[in-house]
């Protein structure tokens, strides 16, 4: 943040800042609750701290998936949509629910936390699986352990594209459980559309795979 302030502040005044971050973000108090891949931001007066770093300007913070949903509602595929769900596929699964044009936070700021949907093999080592276990990033970690090497989600895709049948089986789990998650969202929330973003959404043919898995 200091680097951003120095680079921008020397060219023009900073009037305010908006920050998206993982976790159960309380936009009113400016505190991040729950858990995420960035534990250092939880339970501290994050908005107040950021405002101080930027010279006391107003700062807004919100969950990253909700910011993605707002962006799609403003200038993306959800323009004109009043009821939709947005999910992001990265190291986990982010989610945001939009109803009557507004983000639903829920009574515990957890509405849209679809990453925790239980699914998969409950007897797998490590206990009950959840949707986030089936992202390309986490599937690559599991296959990497089998191979005895570090493997990224991108490398998992490359292995599958180059004929590695086991890698293809892991990716089939990604398609299957992503489709299952979308089906659960559709029946629970009945959105007009489900918007998919994040690094995992860049996979060519993803929508075709999901349509096949959902029987369309």
Descriptions of predicted regions:
Residues 33, 104-105:
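Generic structural signal for well-ordered beta-strand positions
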Residues 31-43:
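A charged helix-plus-loop insertion that forms the helical arch/lid used to bind
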Residues 94-98:
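Short beta-strand scaffold segments in enzyme catalytic cores
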Residues 85-87:
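Conserved beta-strand elements of the Class I
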Residues 1-18, 25-29, 47-59, 71-81, ...:
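ATP-binding/phosphotransfer module of carbohydrate and carboxylate kinases, centering on a glycine-rich
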Residues 21, 99-100:
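A cytosolic small-molecule/anion-sensing beta-strand core signal
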Residues 64, 90:
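Active-site glycine-centered loops adjacent to acidic/histidine catalytic or metal-binding residues
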Residues 40-41, 106, 111-113:
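A short acidic/small-residue loop/turn micro-motif
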